[in-house]
Amino acid sequence: MKVSLPAFEKARVLVVGDVMLDRYWVGPTGRISPEAPVPVVKINQVEDRPGGAANVALNIATLGGQVQLAGLVGQDDTAHALTLGVQTLGVEPQWLTIADKPTITKLRVLSRNQQLIRLDFEEAFDKADSVRLLKQSEALLDSVDVVVLSDYAKGAIDQPRDFIALARAKGVMVLVDPKGSDFGRYQGASLITPNMSEFEAVVGTVTSEADLLEKARGLLKQHHFDAILVTRSEKGMTLVTANAPELHIPTVAREVYDVTGAGDTVISALATSLAAGADLPQACAIANTAAGVVVGKLGTSTVSRIELIEALALHHGESGFGVVSEDQLAYALEQAKLRGERVVMTNGCFDILHAGHVSYLKQAKALGDRLIVAVNDDASVKRLKGEGRPVNQVDRRMAVLAGLASVDWVVPFSEDTPQRIITRLLPNLLVKGGDYKLEDIAGGAEVIAAGGQVQVLGFEDGISTTAIIQNIMANQ
């Protein structure tokens, strides 16, 4: 399935939640204090950035969406700095000022791109303050398509059920970045986006992929959510809805410098995409890519449309689906079979994807409902093909394959043959390209023994990765 960015400028979003100011003091450190065993930092840079719900709003604005921001602030200089910070990018602040409370501030001291300490300046807001904020925000619902509740457990979002119900009654989607052990507070929300720790704090320890899906569906039913997107760090994201198969989206982050604000980026990209007309799976793929960009930056950051376009092209070959872990695939395959779908599987190196590959995979997909492509990892290709191979690393090979309309799932394997992974997955039909004899196809006997079939498909003559490489070398 292809992913294309919608017209973000059409998105109209209201963000309600805990706003704060992220303040950074930055400088070199070259000695230890004589007063205590701590480093001395000579501050040469001070920077303020909107954080929390304000960072969500900035992310939406940076992508090109129209956004209003409602939150609780104090009557202080920090509130003024926060106002200037959001207005710079065209965010409309709708503050409720609480005179006897400070605007929440997170002060971080950094040196050599490392955070040394964080100091928090805050007092919890009262329940009455939250009631007033949500009541004030009701007047904004008629001018937006999506609402984001950004809850950092600081008091702005206390009991939002009535607000959620009113928004849904008006046809407005409500997305929630939740906190705490009671997701019932958000009953009726369109989508909640807990990270794995937040999810397990509510449902208990997750022991397997199947257990995660069972627990997520339990929450959907219990609290009348339309969907749950669990963000899982290096395992990517898992989207669970009531009436569709689950969707696993692998992480795209190559280097992680700072996870500050990553959750904000996810929900802001989701909100902007959905408000601009994207469907939920596409919005999740866009959000996953945006998160992969932002964790490669230091401190609370935003992601621009240009960065998102570049990241989608680099990491997905324009596709947000397909690449899964073996465990994720095993469960997805089980569910596909329960739905009566015929699953076809093939394998190969696919080092340089060419017309012969595309034709072959199209033929394979035509034989069933779902197509799995198992791909040799880099070490396996090198053992099979020799020095100088693979030309393309496995993540890029898989990303390109996942971009093909004929391919549903792509999974890597490390052995020289796919015998083990085929034996584990046992597709309905195993196909192989070339002039193989059926009895020589790895995993074929096991598939047949399990009631499946094995079939050989022809390749287009004269097209091969080796021939392409030799032709390139000859013309250098």
Curated annotation (Swiss-Prot):
Recorded GO MF terms: ATP binding; heptose 7-phosphate kinase activity; heptose-1-phosphate adenylyltransferase activity; phosphotransferase activity, alcohol group as acceptor
Active-site positions on this chain: D264
EC number(s) given by UniProt: 2.7.1.167, 2.7.7.70
Organism, as annotated: Shewanella baltica (strain OS223)
Chain spans, region Cytidylyltransferase: 345-476
Region annotation (Ribokinase) ranges: 1-319
Matching PROSITE patterns: PFKB_KINASES_1 (PS00583), PFKB_KINASES_2 (PS00584)
Subunit structure, as described in the record: Homodimer.
Chain positions recorded as ATP binding sites: N195, M196, S197, E198
Family, similarity comment: In the N-terminal section; belongs to the carbohydrate kinase PfkB family. In the C-terminal section; belongs to the cytidylyltransferase family.
UniProt entry tagged with the keyword Repeat: no
Name of this chain's protein: Bifunctional protein HldE
Pathway per the UniProt entry: Nucleotide-sugar biosynthesis; ADP-L-glycero-beta-D-manno-heptose biosynthesis; ADP-L-glycero-beta-D-manno-heptose from D-glycero-beta-D-manno-heptose 7-phosphate: step 1/4; Nucleotide-sugar biosynthesis; ADP-L-glycero-beta-D-manno-heptose biosynthesis; ADP-L-glycero-beta-D-manno-heptose from D-glycero-beta-D-manno-heptose 7-phosphate: step 3/4
Matches recorded under NCBIfam families: cyt_tran_rel, PRK11316.1, rfaE_dom_I, rfaE_dom_II
GO biological process entries: ADP-L-glycero-beta-D-manno-heptose biosynthetic process
Function according to Swiss-Prot or TrEMBL: Catalyzes the ADP transfer from ATP to D-glycero-beta-D-manno-heptose 1-phosphate, yielding ADP-D-glycero-beta-D-manno-heptose.
Alphabetized UniProt keyword annotations: ATP-binding, Carbohydrate metabolism, Kinase, Multifunctional enzyme, Nucleotide-binding, Nucleotidyltransferase, Transferase
Membrane-spanning residues: none
